[in-house]
Regions:
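Amphipathic alpha-helical interface elements
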Residues: 1-173
Length: 173
């Protein structure tokens, strides 16, 4: 357990350090990539324990391989809350905005700013007198959601699906 915790902490510290000196575009793409990885782990903890099935579902080009699909699946399977779903969808839209923009893209652009201001999780935690920038709201949301997804993955492991027993005819009459 200590190894898992220290590994997660090192992973987290590495991400925070990387965010400090990156452009807005890099932060948006790195943050969503990080969340996508954790959503994949969450789903993998929940589905049956079969590496082939996991790869078939969660592989990059497969049904649950995209950030959008993983967000929807995690919510549809009841693995994340409505608020987490809301913020993940907004983060997905923010990321798409940065990917589509051939220029660098910035968090202070009006449409990105609006999406960041709609994130719900920071408003539950940040003090009212604080006025964080859209970039900070985004980074803060990614940080909180990453921790939540790690915690949810450990919960999902206790609810791991198992294949059903052998086929059995049922008399419906």
């Amino acid at each position: 357990m200590v190894k898992k915790t220290s590994q997660k902490l090192r992973e987290w510290q590495k991400l925070v350090k990387e965010f400090q000196h990156k452009s807005d575009r890099s932060v948006a793409i790195l943050g969503t990539t990080y969340l996508n990885t954790h959503l994949g782990r969450l789903l993998d903890c929940f589905i049956i324990d079969d590496a082939r099935v996991s790869k078939m579902l969660l592989g990059e080009e497969n049904p649950l391989g995209t950030f959008e699909a993983r967000i929807k699946a995690a919510y549809g399977f009841g693995l994340i809350s409505k608020k987490e779903y809301h913020d993940l969808v907004h983060i997905w839209h923010i990321r798409n905005r940065f990917i589509r923009d051939l220029d660098e893209g910035r968090f202070d652009e009006e449409d990105v700013q609006e999406l960041c201001l709609r994130l719900k999780i920071p408003h539950d935690v940040i003090l009212r007198q604080e006025e964080p920038t859209p970039r900070r709201l985004f980074v803060f949301s990614v940080a909180i959601l990453a921790q939540q997804l790690m915690w949810r993955a450990s919960q999902a492991a206790h609810e791991k699906r198992t294949p059903r027993d052998n086929f059995m005819l049922v008399d419906l009459g």
